[in-house]
């Protein structure tokens, strides 16, 4: 009797020896993984877990970090540099620390410290309220009193050379000086008033821009405004103004107030030796504003100093709607983001400052700390993903993260990598790392970093009250590292009957490490263990693994300790569409 001859199934081998990281999409390539934990691109193309993290220090209340010659951070009320604490009376809010030369500006406290001389620190703002009588008198620009002035509507008769006359024949009154050479009274274009009171000038510096209030004299109401201090002593200040006679305001008439203010800013950055900031909402004076500000050149204390010079402060209103969501300096230009646009400031002094507005994907609200620069490219969290901005238009860099929705992103950069921790819709934190040189994402763990800071050869993060080292320097922070990778659907793209008869994994393991292999078959949700391997010595393995016969499957590899996977080879036996 003759029987039909069985047709031998065609067998093929597919080897993956280049592993390209995380891709959380429905269809992914061989060598990519739908899910992972604690993996890294450091050993690319080899698949390997990351290094263990370390701990730098465990302060009582870390609130912010900045890199100077050494790592500086805020611990409660202290600013700490080189592990030397300076009690600055800081509040307990999260900080934004901005470097400007040797100085560090601490927001929202509006304080500063000189990192070259930590005994030099103070407040950006200053204020004086009089507690005794205040005297107003006409003076020169350096504060010297005028003497023997005539106040009248008619010219003085037979004046001496350089005689002074306040002409009251018209308003506003004018101060004139007699020139014997030309036999003419010449108007003095700019006149100054000395405001004298004990201690009035001690908190301020020459050329500070201040707000003055509380002056009751009708003739001096113009002084209740923003003024520039042209000269000062401990007990007087000199501002622009004119009055006919010496005037005194008694304590009973009320106190005068002199203030050097900094605007209430949503976000702040430094560019070209100026501090830049933005505000959307109610300002100090109660007005609703939508403005961008710049401090005086080289002087972070002055935000309302207008002298007609290239060093002046700067303020400009914006025409776009919505709150500001972040600020950073990129390629020498201050950038101010909203969710749907970016404002870019061009120019190098107030007269030629220009603000260009580009409608594009901006920074998502609540993700202002996601702004970080890697190799001249700015990365940030927009509403629909991570964007890369090179100065023209942003492009998406996070296709591999899939369709998951994330918020509250905090990011840092070190070397070629962009580290970002984000919260998903379930409230779970996830740390992702984007290797910009290799174009690959990797998922680490559920670390919730409050801030990052790259200093020298380490990336620091504040998490759970510790300052940890992401690259592993310092004391031990973690035990044996647990890691995992999970493939996408293997075999689902082919319509023919087939099954994976064998998996061969080439790998090496450190002493004490353990690796477990699991499979999920067809549409089952259960994971079945295939193989467990424990290493008692440092060696490499080639593991033959035989999964069940199925149409498609997923592979999950879990491990504890250091291991490296060099290749995964599939042996596939394949028939036709029917058999």
Where are these regions (language model features)?
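Beta-strand-rich solenoidal segments
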Residues: 85-138, 225-226
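Blade-loop segments of beta-propeller domains
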Residues: 60-62, 67-68, 76, 81-101
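Short hydrophobic/aromatic-rich beta-strand motifs
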Residues: 102-106, 156-177, 207-213, 227, ...
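Small/polar beta-strand repeat architecture
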Residues: 4-9, 122-126, 130, 171, ...
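Beta-propeller and closely related beta-pinwheel folds
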Residues: 52, 261-413, 440-443
């Amino acid at each position: 009797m003759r029987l039909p001859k069985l047709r031998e199934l065609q067998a093929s081998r597919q080897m993956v020896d280049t592993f390209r990281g995380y891709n959380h999409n429905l269809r992914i390539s061989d060598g990519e993984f739908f899910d992972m934990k604690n993996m890294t691109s450091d050993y690319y193309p080899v698949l390997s877990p990351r290094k263990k993290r370390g701990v730098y220090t465990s302060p009582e209340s870390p609130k912010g970090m900045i890199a100077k010659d050494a790592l500086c951070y805020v611990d409660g009320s202290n600013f700490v540099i080189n592990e030397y604490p300076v009690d600055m009376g800081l509040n307990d809010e999260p900080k934004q620390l901005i470097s400007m030369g040797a100085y560090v500006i601490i927001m929202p406290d509006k304080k500063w410290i000189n990192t070259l001389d930590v005994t030099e620190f103070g407040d950006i703002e200053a204020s004086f309220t009089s507690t005794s009588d205040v005297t107003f008198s006409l003076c020169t620009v350096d504060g010297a009193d005028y003497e023997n002035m005539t106040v009248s509507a008619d010219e003085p008769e037979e004046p001496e050379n350089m005689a002074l006359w306040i002409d009251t024949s018209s308003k506003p009154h004018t101060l004139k000086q007699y020139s014997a050479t030309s036999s003419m009274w010449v108007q003095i274009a700019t006149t100054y008033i000395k405001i004298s009171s004990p201690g009035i000038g001690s908190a301020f510096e020459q050329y500070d821009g201040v707000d003055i209030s509380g002056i009751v004299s009708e003739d001096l109401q113009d002084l209740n405004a923003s003024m520039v201090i042209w000269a000062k002593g401990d007990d007087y200040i000199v501002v622009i103004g004119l009055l006919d006679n010496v005037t005194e305001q008694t304590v009973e008439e009320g106190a005068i107030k002199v203030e050097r203010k900094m605007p209430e800013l949503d976000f702040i950055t430094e560019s070209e030796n100026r501090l830049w900031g933005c505000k959307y909402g109610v300002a100090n004076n109660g007005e609703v504003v939508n403005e961008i500000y710049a401090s005086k050149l080289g002087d972070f204390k002055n935000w309302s100093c207008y002298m007609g010079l290239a060093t002046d402060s700067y303020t400009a209103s914006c025409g776009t709607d919505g709150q500001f969501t972040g600020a950073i300096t990129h390629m020498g230009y201050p950038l101010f983001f909203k969710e749907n646009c970016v404002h870019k400031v061009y120019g190098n002094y107030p007269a030629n400052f220009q603000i260009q507005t580009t409608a594009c994907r901006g920074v998502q609200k609540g993700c202002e700390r996601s702004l970080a620069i890697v190799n001249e490219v700015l990365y940030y969290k927009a509403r629909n993903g991570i964007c890369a901005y090179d100065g023209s238009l942003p492009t998406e860099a996070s296709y591999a993260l899939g369709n998951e929705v994330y918020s509250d992103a905090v990011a840092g950069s070190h070397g070629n990598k962009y580290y970002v921790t984000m919260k998903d819709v379930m409230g779970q934190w996830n740390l992702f790392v984007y290797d910009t040189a290799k174009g690959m994402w990797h998922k680490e763990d559920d670390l919730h970093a409050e801030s990052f800071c790259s200093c020298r050869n380490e990336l620091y993060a504040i998490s759970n009250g510790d300052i940890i080292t992401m690259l592993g320097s310092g004391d031990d922070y973690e035990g044996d590292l647990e890691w995992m990778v999970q493939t996408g659907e293997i075999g689902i793209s082919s319509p023919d009957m087939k099954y994976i008869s064998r998996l061969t994994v080439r790998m090496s393991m450190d002493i004490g490490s353990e690796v477990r292999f699991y499979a999920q078959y067809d549409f089952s949700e259960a994971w079945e263990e295939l193989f467990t391997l424990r290493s008692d010595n440092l060696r490499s393995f080639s593991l033959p693994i035989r999964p069940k016969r199925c149409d498609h499957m997923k592979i999950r590899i879990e491990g504890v300790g250091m291991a490296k996977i060099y290749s995964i080879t599939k042996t596939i036996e394949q028939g036709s569409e029917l058999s």
